[in-house]
Amino acid sequence: MTQPVERLPFAVAERVRWSDCDPLGIIFYGSFVRMFEAAEHEMFRAAGLPYEVMRVQRHVQLPRKAFAVEFHSPAQMDELLDIQVGVAKIGTTSLTFRFEVYRSGDGAPLHRASATLTVVCVDKESITKRPLPDFVKEALAPFVIGA
């Protein structure tokens, strides 16, 4: 098991449910995608930019471009996970998020997974990339790693 790295700027708690597990009772890898998305959405909400407001009222579309995950140790059913997220990079048209997942609760935290996700800002009509609006960059500034 790897030791905890620095704590990322935002976190949500997620419990591993029966529906998250494979027949061995450990978390199915695809379940992490839902948890990462929940952490991402809640970070945007904490920044004052709920996804639905960004999408509908502010016309900011952020489809996924790249996703990579590394599993360090298996999470098990009913485990409480600390899903941490921070903004690793703000580009001209893209954002890259970093995620770290640890088992919460008693004892030393166990590092369960690490991931990165890159999203690209696109025009709603043409689905072509466009510059990331300044208000998004400003709202996410407190969540930038190392800032």
Question: Which positions does each model-derived feature cover?
Answer:
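Intrinsically disordered, low-complexity regions of eukaryotic proteins
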Residues: 22-24, 72, 84, 102, ...
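Hydrophobic beta-strand-centered segment that forms part of the acyl-chain substrate-binding groove
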Residues: 43-95, 112-113
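Residue-level recognition of specific faces of alpha-helices
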Residues: 32-35, 63, 118
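HotDog/MaoC-like acyl-thioester-processing domains
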Residues: 2-12, 76-80, 88-147
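Catalytic strand-loop segment that frames the active site of acyl-thioester-processing enzymes
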Residues: 1-49
